[in-house]
Amino acid sequence: MSSLPTSDGFNHPARSSGQSPDVGNPMSLARSVSASVCPIKPSDSDRIEPKAVKALKASAEFQLNSEKKEHLSLQDLSDHASSADHAPTDQSPAMPMQNSSEEITVAGNLEKSAERSTQGLKFHLHTRQEASLSVTSTRMHEPQMFLGEKDWHPENQNLSQVSDPQQHEEPGNEQYEVAQQKASHDQEYLCNIGDLELPEERQQNQHKIVDLEATMKGNGLPQNVDPPSAKKSIPSSECSGCSNSETFMEIDTAQQSLVTLLNSTGRQNANVKNIGALDLTLDNPLMEVETSKCNPSSEILNDSISTQDLQPPETNVEIPGTNKEYGHYSSPSLCGSCQPSVESAEESCPSITAALKELHELLVVSSKPASENTSEEVICQSETIAEGQTSIKDLSERWTQNEHLTQNEQCPQVSFHQAISVSVETEKLTGTSSDTGREAVENVNFRSLGDGLSTDKEGVPKSRESINKNRSVTVTSAKTSNQLHCTLGVEISPKLLAGEEDALNQTSEQTKSLSSNFILVKDLGQGIQNSVTDRPETRENVCPDASRPLLEYEPPTSHPSSSPAILPPLIFPATDIDRILRAGFTLQEALGALHRVGGNADLALLVLLAKNIVVPT
């Protein structure tokens, strides 16, 4: 159906007589109103008025051109316009426009109404764009802006008669009767929703309904009424230019006037919430909202709204289907190309236990090649939350660089014919009463020990000089820690003897935050050395053997430190050592455990037994 834009901002479909589906039923009047709304942004408030004035000027020019074309039939139209004397008082008699002064008056009135309408539109959109855009308030402004000016109704009526000379006007008394019937029907409908309105608002709305009916008749809104006694139709809609084709609000109403539609839909539908907070993408700019509401008379109210660019291009319009008045009727359903969808993205993260298992498996697999490539290597793995770890390949390369120096500069008292690989895995033990933790030596595997240890103190100065010059122990850790104890041999730092329990408890707490540390300890050829690796900036706990010099160590990002400190050997009773040996442990393990616990044989034996406990992961 073709529609022609008019100067009042509405597009009225041109219908011929007899086209209405509700012939002979004045209560079932059907009319279609199309509103053209300009896309308004907060920064474009100064552009509203020029666009509206331009559109209405083009409208006036189009009407004047139509008047000139139909100038020959003005005399015939004046005869038909004489029947409008019986119309209500707000409809003036139709007078044909024949001179240029009346044309100027029409243009002036149109511009005046355009200014008023743009002011109202500007005020409304600026007050509603940040909070909630109410459908009711939006529609309430439209009849007031476009239909409230009574001074140009006669001109519009005359222009409509000029634009379509072949259609005749319905007698005024029938129009008045229809208006009275619709006014009474609207009053009854307003009584249904009167609990939300004040009596003053009802009276005002009733007057607006009557004025709207008369105004729509004067403006030429198509009301196809074909009673049995009259076979005439209302003049068709007037023609006016509309420069904006971006946004259309099409409102198809049945059995309701425009103001009644505003009141009913404004209370049946909740306001459009958070217009400025949501996103309306330009890819899907159109959204149709079809509301099917039923009043107590089972009358259908179809509201099809197609909106585009009412807000800035990054707003998403969401209309909740809240039905306050008629909860048992159908709620508005959202349809079209811009139906909003709620997407809930739930991020699933693996549990800490699963992550630790994976990390432990990776560390075990990656530590196997390194233990075979080195002649004397100690790998201490702290099974805790770990991310930053040093590659074992790099550790092996560091070891091989110093390996030939070790073999060439061994002391004559000690000789290793075969490589010794010590793999120490430190874990946190939470179920032991001594709180020693699994950072104690768990697995000590000696492949082959040659001649053993030498306790000859005469060779100590010579070996220490050569060691300090040419060799260093590479202790590589991914993250520095205060105390990570790897007991690998006979001697332990006497610092642990003073506060053994405090040190072990601190170690248990600190290993929780350690990353997987790979510590590569290079034996200097004097026997199995003991090392307690700490942060080099804070403290240095160096653990040599009973008669051996200290070990030099370097973190992965620093040079080998050269601050030796010789610790005196500790002597333990032979009975305690024999007791531990009879339990199935080696001499080195017995001496290391005794040094660790300060000579307490019972506690040393308990530590050695606890390291064999396997905690399921």
Curated annotation (Swiss-Prot):
Keyword Transcription set for record: yes
Keyword Transcription regulation in annotation: yes
UniProt-annotated location(s): Cell membrane; Nucleus; Golgi apparatus, trans-Golgi network
Keywords noted in UniProt: Cell membrane, Golgi apparatus, Membrane, Nucleus, Transcription, Transcription regulation
Quaternary structure note: Interacts with YRDC.
Free-text note regarding domains: The tripeptides QCP and QSP mediate post-transcriptional down-regulation of SLC5A1 at the trans-Golgi network. They inhibit a monosaccharide-dependent exocytotic pathway of SLC5A1.
Protein name: Regulatory solute carrier protein family 1 member 1
Taxon lineage: Eukaryota, Metazoa, Chordata, Craniata, Vertebrata
